[in-house]
Amino acid sequence: MNRIMTAPFSHYLEALRIQRWDDHRYYHHSRINQSLHLLSAMSFVVSYVFLFIDPALSALIAWGISMTSRQSGHFFFEPRGYDHVNRATHEHKEDIKIGYNLRRKVVLMALWAAAPAVLYFSPNFLGLLNEEVVRGGYLKSLGLIWFYIGIGGLIFRTVHLFFLRDVTTGLVWALKIMTDPFHDILLYWRSPLALLRGELIDPMDHAQSTH
């Protein structure tokens, strides 16, 4: 632990760079997925603005727009065949995924999708919401539930990585997740233009040059 705490800041920046690069080159080949990530990123930035003003509204934006567009890109548009750029199978990429791979995302998204139904039949969400929150209305309650699901998902996987990998990997991954919206805007702002040209798959020439 002492070694982790005394590691130079450049060590964490390099680990962050590697995680971001691997995430891009392995899991973001589809231009539609990239464009949806751009929409997601811009929506996340808006949700960040409301985070300390109205957490419920922030979560409604984050889950209702950002996560929906982001995950639909992964589930429906990202190729699942053999990755010739990285010379890796889909199964291998799923196994080495640091964050939430598709299997883990199914669990997280199931919790998200189940929350509105549970709240409809139990306005206090099985006793977890106090009366003041319930009086705020359905959307206010739903936003707070989604807020805690999001925070819980981030903390759970971060701590999980402490044991699966190491503390540095977990902390860097958490930082990556929180700053991804800003990075994705810089990375994918050209993707809609590529789509308009009819380019459905990023040729990933920049990734192939690293092999």
Regions found by a protein language model. Give the residues of each.
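Membrane-helix exit/interface motif
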Residues: S47-F50, S72-G81, A117-V118
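C-terminal halves and exits of single transmembrane alpha-helices
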Residues: N101-F125, L186-L193
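Hydrophobic alpha-helical membrane-embedded segments
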Residues: I53-E78, I151-L164
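Membrane interfacial helix-start motif at the N-side
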Residues: R17-Y48, E94-A110
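Membrane-proximal soluble regions of multi-pass membrane proteins
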Residues: N2-H24, F75-G99, V159-H211
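Helix-coil boundary and interhelical linker segments in multi-pass alpha-helical membrane proteins
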Residues: V46-I61, V118-L144
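Alpha-helical transmembrane segments and their membrane-interface junctions
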Residues: L111-E132, R197-T210
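An amphipathic alpha-helical core segment
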Residues: L139-F156
